[in-house]
Amino acid sequence: MKTSRLPIAIQQAVMRRLREKLAQANLKLGRNYPEPKLSYTQRGTSAGTAWLESYEIRLNPVLLLENSEAFIEEVVPHELAHLLVWKHFGRVAPHGKEWKWMMESVLGVPARRTHQFELQSVRRNTFPYSCKCQEHQLTVRRHNRVVRGEAVYRCVHCGEQLVAK
């Protein structure tokens, strides 16, 4: 994977969004939750992750650089919501009703579980598989699970088992 140096302007925009949404949440919840640690160490196809125990948000620098505006608007509040839900409710379903409420009612952001960013630049080796209706690209991890007989994957559209090409 290529590594990227993030321009300071993008890092500042991320911090502005994080602080803005945290202040909004603290005001609406009547709390004073601290600012989480922020790092740009997320890799692979995940845009970001929230680490509850260390109260940290890890963002993918490549996807951030390639999709700055949408990333800052969507991913930063998404991960912050996970931390706020954990602080406010304790351990609950990652994208459950509490998270959805936090996103929509408290942070004022549409509650989307996944991003729609182009992943070609962050995708490592993939392996072609097919079904009746289309070709699929499986990650190295999923491909190895198939090879070892540990997993079977099916198409979400036609339901047929995926077969290596």
UniProtKB/Swiss-Prot annotation:
Keyword terms, alphabetized: Cytoplasm, Metal-binding, Zinc
Positions annotated to bind Zn(2+): H78, H82
Gene3D superfamilies per record: Metalloproteases ('zincins'), catalytic domain
GO terms (BP aspect): response to stress
Domain SprT-like: 20-163
Signal peptide span: none
Cellular localisation: Cytoplasm
Gene Ontology terms for molecular function: zinc ion binding
One GO location term (cellular component): cytoplasm
Name by which UniProt lists this protein: Protein SprT
Species this protein is from: Escherichia coli O157:H7
